[in-house]
């Protein structure tokens, strides 16, 4: 699944393998994917901003194109 097309429901966490896979990830928008900082390297079009580690995973993770 394309990282940008990945849904982003609230209240959970995200994982990555070959592409970004959001599994109940907490983020501001449900139209973009959301990954924790450690997923940046595999989520090519997904960037985490506003926090790092647990803080980013918690609620400050956002996705840009």
Curated annotation (Swiss-Prot):
A divalent metal cation 6 binds at residues 35, 39, 42, 64. GO terms for molecular function: cadmium ion binding; copper ion binding; metal ion sequestering activity; protein kinase activator activity; zinc ion binding. A divalent metal cation 3 binds at residues 16, 20, 25. GO terms for cellular component: inclusion body; nucleus; perinuclear region of cytoplasm; synaptic vesicle. A divalent metal cation 5 binds at residues 34-35, 48. Residues 31-65 are annotated as: Alpha. A divalent metal cation 4 binds at residues 42, 46. The modification Phosphoserine is found at residue 33. The modification N-acetylmethionine is found at residue 1. The keyword Metal-binding applies. A divalent metal cation 7 binds at residues 48, 61, 63-64. One of its GO terms (biological process) is response to hypoxia. Gene3D superfamilies: Metallothionein Isoform II (4.10.10.10). It comes from the Eukaryota. Keywords: Acetylation, Copper, Metal-binding, Metal-thiolate cluster, Phosphoprotein, Zinc. It holds the Pfam family Metallothio. A divalent metal cation 1 binds at residues 6, 8, 22, 25. The keyword Protease does not apply. Residues 1-30 are annotated as: Beta. A divalent metal cation 2 binds at residues 8, 14, 16, 27. PANTHER family: METALLOTHIONEIN (PTHR23299), METALLOTHIONEIN-3 (PTHR23299:SF18). Belongs to the metallothionein superfamily. Type 1 family. Binds heavy metals. Contains five zinc and one copper atoms per polypeptide chain and only a negligible amount of cadmium. This is Metallothionein-3.
């Amino acid at each position: 699944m394309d990282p940008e097309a990945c849904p982003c429901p609230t209240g959970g966490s995200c994982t990555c393998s070959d592409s970004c896979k959001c599994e109940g990830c907490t983020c501001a928008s449900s139209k973009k994917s959301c990954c924790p900082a450690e997923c940046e390297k595999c989520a090519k079009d997904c960037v985490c901003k506003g926090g790092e580690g647990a803080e980013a995973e918690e609620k400050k993770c956002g996705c840009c194109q």
